[in-house]
């Protein structure tokens, strides 16, 4: 198991995420939206009212290992991201976390080193339609640490006014707006799952979440 300690204060690369519609079956693979494929011991995370958090993506870490030369993430296993995003996808009756740092329970990151035996967790509306956006394919390439867009690692693209929230942290996942999904974060915003800059690379126990908006 890798236990490299990550350090802060120097320029690091990030990993750009490209997200593309596909007809391919992505069960058990890296994908954005769709249904999460979880180990038997894991449940789909819920908010404090018992409602399912929006499943954002799952990433097979083998897919990004060649781009992570500093070993800031494990190079085996799967990581899953969830957050309370229905409001920003057009459901104006859903809870809205606002700008700045969100409360615990409104987001969740899961990690498992073993992802050989996963169960697809499906969720449908009463009319039988999937209660999720269609799963989309993900590809990865190198990026600069402060780039906008969808990326792993690096630093948040939007920092002005949020310096206190970001101190001592680095971005784990950054998510930008996307017209194709009707996804907006107020006025030109981004969200970031944040982790301590100094940590072992398989430690996801202290994740925070921040919405940055101009």
Q: Which positions does each model-derived feature cover?
A:
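Preference for intrinsically disordered or flexible, low-complexity segments
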Residues: 1-214
